């Protein structure tokens, strides 16, 4: 009997454990590879295998990416989708959510959990429970000093708890297209369920650089924090990014760098995000899992410097609307006659002039292949043109309904290239053709006025023609009556003359 009880208890315990395991979500484990710096240095660079693409430099980072911010074009790719622990570059997402959900002057009160849930040996600025900072001051502390308690305080200020804030982080990451990311906290301290990839971090960085506040704060070399309700003294905070601030060395200072964030833990090794403007391009560089050499900033910053030099020297940014010929709308044509009626006006449809492509230096714009995709349900955007080169997307722009004065009747064939032909073939056509209509309102007004006058004239003529018909019928009846009277009169005259002759010759001559 006891043996039966033990058996039953074992089964129930096993079932309980199994249900407990199944009830918790599973997360992808970060693959740990025991690699030396030399092993990482000689790992394959995927972008170097792209046809007609400039060869990029070898770097010591296990994963690295360079992306152009406005187009999303990937210029350099090395293991960009591998999952890694991000360390403090996590705070880029924390700052993004703060900028999207807070005003800078909002007051943030530090809770007990925000201050004391972090390891005291980690990055912080020694805030106390109950201390009050503004959102802006917290952002300076997060981006310059990588303050973990400030990250916690911002998270609780926005979502109530750091756990709820982590859910917001994951939702926002998914919206940005991140596929290899899961956040577990707002600061980046080690957690096996807290990971991302170089590509995903570049997507997050691409979004946050749209905020001028991020550029201003992250690009500051230092910031003086005022005295607070619990601190009587000011605090000078320094940016830990060596390309922005001479925090420990001036060797890597670069005036083209406008933002960045550092990260380090023993499991993540060095991580770094850097934003720089080179050759008219905003370049976003992310390196992950870089092992230090013992020399200050090497190879972490030498890798980034080499990648920024490579991108700035080997690529060019080209405006689409200024170079696109297949989709150009000619403003001086009226039914392809080359004449303009009254004056030139804004076309009904035009290419968005803010669209760009990024191509290797020396490559002509015509080498990029456009693909046209129509957009439904948008009052302004009619279609999107996406360009590719060497099998990679290199930029896009929108075809817009201007909503202003409409120009000329112009039916112009648009050739969308090979990809456009394939798209049209799928729709049962032989080639990709789009006919655009431009209308001059003055012409429409003149034509409409002429049509109205013609209609009025026709109505008037119909009215007069009706009166004329009545008069004509009267005349015809009068003529018939007159003819009848004449005929009757003629008959009477004939009879009269006949009687007169008879009278003339019918006298009795013998009576004389």
Predicted regions and their residues:
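N-terminal hydrophobic targeting segments that direct proteins to the cell envelope
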Residues: 26-44, 421-431, 466-479
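Alpha-helical transmembrane segments
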Residues: 450-467
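Bacterial N-terminal signal peptides that target proteins for export
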Residues: 1-12
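C-terminal segment of classical bacterial N-terminal signal peptides
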Residues: 17-27
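Domain-terminus/edge residues, biased toward the C-terminal soluble/receptor-binding domains
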Residues: 178-179, 193-195, 200, 205-445, ...
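Cytoplasmic C-terminal tails of single-pass
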Residues: 465-512
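Hydrophobic H-region at the start of alpha-helical membrane spans
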Residues: 10, 442-453
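Active-site-adjacent loops and short helices of periplasmic peptidoglycan-processing enzymes
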Residues: 3, 28-199, 203-217
